[in-house]
Amino acid sequence: SSSAASDVYKRQDKIRPDDGSMSDGFKITENYESGGAGLAGTVDAYSLFADALCNGGVGVTGKRILGEKMIRLFMTGYTTGIMQDDFVVTGKKGYRYGLGVRVLNDTAESKSPVGEFGWDGAAGAYVMIDPVNHISIFYAQHIVGFPKVYSEIHPVIRDLVYEALEK
């Protein structure tokens, strides 16, 4: 059994150290433009980033990392018509697509407020930013090919946080 920090969970239910060759069949070429595919960082660093976003772009040190205008742009949904129809197929009920993020615009099936935004990782990670209540959630998982995480696990995580706050 290995205890190296680079141990990674693989679909075969085995843990093995990353020897630098792990690709899981997912390769990005130089001409692929994406703002987040392959984003790497620590859970702590990512959590601090999410916390800054839910606090108007100001981090825990008091330094501004993003302008309030940008946060408002994130909170605005831009999809309409067929674009919105395509986005709904992802299972994100009540959401529209905003400036690189999903944005909640219908709270019928969510306990979070309109304007909550975030994004999902290709391997199941989940980020939720609620600037209204100054709440951020970062759920880290790395399991490629587990689609139920987006439509079933993420919404439950979100709603459990809000249910806990109601008590």
Regions found by a protein language model. Give the residues of each.
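Catalytic loop of the DD-peptidase/beta-lactamase superfamily, centered on the K-T-G motif
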Residues: R11-K167
